């Protein structure tokens, strides 16, 4: 793939304050849940993210799109510091939530990931019962009675549109569920601890079209309670599910704005070329 020769000063910003050119600090919208300021990320010496400035709106679904290797999953994983286990990986800049720079925060990693939950590309149920898959994380942060835990498990499975399918087999292994059910189980597990933000990294890539449709319907419902950020290679999915879309290329944020505007009338030719299939 050819090297990018983009002029950062001409990056499109979308709605006022939601994005900014590299090296500039954006004005934070009043309802920003996460503010990314001059973020750079490195895998050893490889510069994977370059001066990212972005504000994630609260109570909305934001999609990251772009070709493979553009940095969208890397950006997603900086929000809850998934890189912290790997000393050769490092982030510089600011990721601010509730006035606190999460990159410099002394906040316990487990507590951070309770506030910012994550669902991965492939379903990852724990090797335990459906019930215990949901209860496991809750027990780490709350002391609930059995009755309270029963209510929480039912609540999470209901929110994930799975309760009616599993309510009579809660003691059975999560491995016995279909792929789509397992992914909804993982979403239920993620929201059971009541996070503020839910990160979804290609949550439908391994699923059939019917299961994908159910997950997309679920995403639309979840934004009433959570700020949702999704990485997807499926541009149609981004168009269907998200309120805001960020297009990335070679570690740079090229364009960010309301999804309808990004897909119907993008401000950058690079974005248009990618969305229309002329590139990527």
From Swiss-Prot:
Gene Ontology terms: biological process: phosphate ion transmembrane transport
GO cellular component: plasma membrane
Pfam families assigned to the protein according to its UniProt record, in alphabetical order: ABC_tran (PF00005)
Topological category with respect to the lipid bilayer: Peripheral membrane protein
Keyword Membrane: yes
Protein EC: 7.3.2.1
Subcellular location: Cell inner membrane
Catalytic activity, as annotated: phosphate(out) + ATP + H2O = ADP + 2 phosphate(in) + H(+)
Gene Ontology molecular function: ATP binding; ATP hydrolysis activity; ATPase-coupled phosphate ion transmembrane transporter activity
Origin: domain of life: Bacteria
Residues annotated as binding ATP: 66-73
UniProt keywords, alphabetically: ATP-binding, Cell inner membrane, Cell membrane, Membrane, Nucleotide-binding, Phosphate transport, Translocase, Transport
Physiological role: Part of the ABC transporter complex PstSACB involved in phosphate import. Responsible for energy coupling to the transport system.
Family to which this protein belongs: Belongs to the ABC transporter superfamily. Phosphate importer (TC 3.A.1.7) family.
Name of this chain's protein: Phosphate import ATP-binding protein PstB
């Amino acid at each position: 793939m050819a090297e990018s020769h983009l002029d950062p000063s001409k990056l499109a910003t979308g709605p006022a304050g939601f994005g900014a050119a590299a090296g500039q600090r954006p004005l934070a919208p009043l309802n920003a849940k996460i503010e990314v300021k001059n973020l750079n990320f490195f895998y050893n010496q490889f510069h994977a993210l370059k001066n990212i400035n972005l504000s994630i709106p609260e109570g909305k679904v934001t999609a990251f799109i772009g070709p493979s290797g553009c940095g969208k999953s890397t950006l997603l994983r900086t929000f809850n510091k998934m890189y912290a286990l790997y000393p050769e990986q490092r982030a510089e800049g600011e990721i601010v939530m509730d006035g606190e720079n999460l990159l410099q925060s002394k906040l316990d990693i487990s507590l951070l990931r309770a506030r910012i939950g994550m669902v991965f590309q492939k379903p990852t149920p724990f090797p335990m019962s459906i019930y215990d898959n949901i209860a496991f994380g809750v027990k780490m942060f709350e002391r609930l009675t059995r009755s309270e835990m029963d209510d929480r498990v039912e609540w999470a499975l209901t929110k994930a549109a799975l309760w009616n399918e599993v309510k009579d087999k809660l003691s059975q292994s999560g491995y016995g569920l279909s792929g789509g059910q397992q992914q909804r189980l993982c979403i239920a597990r993620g929201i059971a601890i009541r996070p503020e933000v839910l990160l979804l990294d290609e949550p439908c890539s391994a699923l059939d079209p019917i299961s994908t449709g159910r997950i997309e319907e679920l995403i639309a419902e979840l934004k009433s309670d959570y700020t949702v950020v999704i990485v997807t290679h499926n541009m149609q999915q981004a168009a269907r599910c998200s309120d805001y879309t960020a297009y990335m290329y070679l570690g740079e944020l090229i364009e960010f704005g309301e999804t309808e505007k990004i897909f119907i009338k993008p401000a950058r030719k690079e974005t248009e070329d990618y969305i229309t299939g002329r590139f990527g």
